[in-house]
């Protein structure tokens, strides 16, 4: 599968994705509150992989500007529907990837995104370039390498082979941290926000060096 086929996958599943409940609502709320505390009213924020815009709509009211992007045009269409129902002046949705963007941002947010990119080092380097000096890079990422090996070794490859899953990387949390540091970031905090079961989704706050 290519990035174009990844986009088609998310286009096909966008309505089902939008209707699905958040598996750990309390953990999600914890991540939202932590992120709000890190952002200020003068901040220019970029969110990559925003999906149907749920997080963007929660956070955009507290910053100067908030650009929320996703590879899937159908996901962005749903996000725009939500935005029309409850407008937030600072918020703009756009179909785009990190590689297609320019400008400077004070914070880049990526939630449930980094395991889906095909070139993790390249994406991290691009995020670094998009950040202003001392800008914050805030992420929360499923680390499949720390999950049940049957998922990454059998189930996901089989689902990808028949078009039932997008591209997914199965790195460990330690490997993700190493990649973030190697891209020119200082990791300020690594936190666990889950309230159910084992947490394999580290919430990482990093600063551009």
Q: Which ranges hold each PLM region?
A:
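Conserved class I S-adenosyl-L-methionine
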Residues: 1-40, 138-160, 194
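Class I SAM-dependent methyltransferase SAM/SAH-binding core
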Residues: 46-48, 52-99
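A conserved beta-strand element that flanks and buttresses the S-adenosyl-L-methionine
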Residues: 109
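Short catalytic micro-motifs in class I SAM-dependent methyltransferases
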Residues: 112-113
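A short glycine-rich, Lys/Arg-flanked "PGG" loop and its adjoining helix->strand segment in the class I
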Residues: 121-133
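Acceptor-substrate binding/catalytic loop of class I
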Residues: 158-174
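Core SAM-dependent methyltransferase catalytic element
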Residues: 183-185, 189-209
């Amino acid at each position: 599968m290519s990035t174009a086929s990844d986009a088609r996958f998310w286009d096909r599943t966008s309505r089902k994705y939008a209707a699905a409940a958040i598996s750990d609502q309390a953990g999600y709320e914890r991540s939202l509150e932590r992120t709000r505390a890190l952002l200020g009213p003068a901040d220019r924020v970029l969110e990559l992989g925003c999906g149907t815009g749920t997080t963007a709509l929660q956070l955009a009211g507290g910053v100067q500007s908030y650009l929320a992007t996703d590879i899937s045009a159908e996901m962005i269409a749903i996000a725009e529907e939500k935005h029309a129902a409850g407008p937030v002046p600072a918020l703009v949705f756009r179909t785009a990837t990190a590689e297609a963007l320019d400008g400077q941002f004070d914070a880049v947010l990526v939630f449930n995104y980094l395991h889906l990119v095909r070139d993790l080092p390249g994406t991290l380097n691009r995020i670094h370039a998009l950040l202003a000096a001392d800008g914050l890079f805030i992420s929360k990422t499923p680390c499949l390498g720390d999950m049940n090996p049957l998922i990454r070794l059998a189930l996901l490859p089989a689902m990808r082979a028949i078009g039932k899953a997008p591209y997914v990387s199965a790195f460990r949390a330690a490997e993700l941290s190493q990649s973030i540091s190697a891209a020119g970031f200082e990791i300020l905090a690594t936190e666990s926000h889950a309230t159910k079961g084992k947490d394999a989704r580290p919430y990482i706050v990093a600063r551009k060096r």
